[in-house]
């Protein structure tokens, strides 16, 4: 099964070279994108992850406990969104770790493992090397995310002391998302104010050179839909993907 559509590599290379990022529309083949969306919406056993500013406390709520929590109880766990002026970092979103071994991946979410495998194929790593101009990448780490009401990812640079990250790699898989709902990706200026805002667009890949200031704005409290994505990094170290 083919995973992605044909890409205009020369055009993407030029844009990345000029701006430090590219937005690749319709990355996955239609049937693959639809299957991934269905898995994310209906099949994935989500965990809830959050980090409080000031205390730095990180919490994880497992899928069984998350199912038992009421919306009000979940809201109490969501921290206040940090800003650059706070000199701190906060987040709140649901996450699922894709097993790298297909045999370890339950059938209802097998399509996510298939995508993870393709992202780490020689073919795809070669495409990213061409686009970014950096062939040292050996892995595309990939997790699933779900942002619900009040969830956010505060301003940060994507720097890591333990990893050599070349580019952030985020594939949006939300349908009919509206910008006024929040949950928008944004590049920020030096004052941490959003200056380039990119609302989630189904089956669009955001690939950008790191480090770079960015965030995901808070999802508004009235929103009843979920924002889905596959996120990770094109990086040097091979840590998470094992065949």
Indicate residue ranges for each PLM-predicted region.
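Fe(II)/2-oxoglutarate oxygenase catalytic core
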Residues: 1-205, 211-243
